Regions:
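Cleavable N-terminal export/targeting peptides
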Residues: 1-34
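Short glycine/proline- and aromatic-enriched beta-strand/turn motifs that initiate or cap beta-hairpins
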Residues: 24-71, 145, 224-233
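Gram-negative (and chloroplast) outer-membrane scaffold detector with strong preference
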Residues: 25-27, 70-153, 220-233
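Extracellular loop and loop/strand-boundary signature of outer-membrane beta-barrel proteins
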Residues: 28, 50-54, 97-107, 155-162, ...
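Residues that define the transmembrane beta-barrel architecture of outer-membrane proteins
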Residues: 36, 58-64, 107-113, 130, ...
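Transmembrane beta-barrel strands of outer-membrane/channel proteins
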Residues: 40-46, 80-84, 134-140, 176, ...
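Flexible, surface-exposed loop regions and adjacent strand-edge segments
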Residues: 58-60, 94-101, 149-157, 203-211
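Predominantly the C-terminal beta-signal and adjacent terminal strand-loop region
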Residues: 87, 181-233
Length: 233
């Protein structure tokens, strides 16, 4: 009988030794928590800009910028960005025939500052290194550098010249961040900006617009694709 009890205890002990490693194993999670809550980034891209029906506004551009981000907790972050659009525009003289109004092409560089709420779709975690997101917000844009040389040479009246001015901008975007390491990450983003183009007051003179076809203003979009790198801290 003691021999039987000893044999039973030995079997139970052996089973326990076999099961212990298996019970200690854990299935690795595809999600990794992101510890750092602040981020500084630089980005470059290309922008497809709508110049408007009268083709007065800025056109396609090379785009550069910088961004500061801070996490607010959970899935929400704030992005504060400054973006430079290195663009061109068609310089038009409304006093000339409609098929001969364009007298030249000039540079126009725009600066855009905006603040956006970012919704991280995986929260404060990344999935296999990826963290997809959506953003929305607003800001303002204004010209940083404008080439008016052709207008001066053509002696265009000031009321006939297009001026971008300071414009409110609406912004939305979507993309994903790929975390290369705990602090370094890459980000690809498709962005849509919305702003208003205003027609110069001189264009509404009777001799320039006898049929009253010109609109006073028009909302246009800038569609951009951005690639950037950021450092988290």
């Amino acid at each position: 009988m003691p021999h039987t009890k000893f044999l039973a205890l030995s079997i139970l002990f052996s089973i326990g030794m076999v099961r212990s490693p298996a019970s200690a194993q854990t299935i690795p999670s595809p999600y990794t928590y992101i510890e750092n809550h602040q981020e500084l980034a630089f980005f470059v891209g290309k922008s497809n800009i709508d110049a408007g029906k009268l083709e007065l506004g800025p056109r396609d551009s090379d785009t550069f910028g910088a961004r500061y981000s801070v996490g607010l907790g959970g899935a929400i972050s704030i992005d504060i960005s400054g973006t430079l659009f290195k663009s061109t525009r068609l310089i038009q003289d409304v006093r000339r025939p409609i098929d001969d109004r364009t007298i030249n092409r000039g540079n126009i560089d725009l600066l855009l500052f905006d603040a956006r709420i970012r919704l991280n779709l995986t929260g404060r975690r990344m999935w296999h290194g990826f963290q997809p997101f959506l953003t929305f917000g607003g800001g303002f844009a204004f010209p940083y550098l404008v080439d008016n040389g052709a207008e001066e040479v053509a002696f265009m009246r000031s009321e006939d010249r297009y001026v971008f001015g300071v414009r409110f901008t609406g912004t939305t975007s979507g993309g994903t961040t790929f975390h290369v390491s705990r602090k370094l990450s890459l980000r690809v983003e498709g962005m849509l900006n919305l702003w208003q183009i205003k027609t110069p007051i001189g264009w509404f003179a009777l001799e320039n617009d006898p049929l009253r076809l010109f609109s006073e203003s028009e909302w246009v979009t800038a569609q951009s694709i951005m690639l950037g790198a950021s450092w988290r801290f």
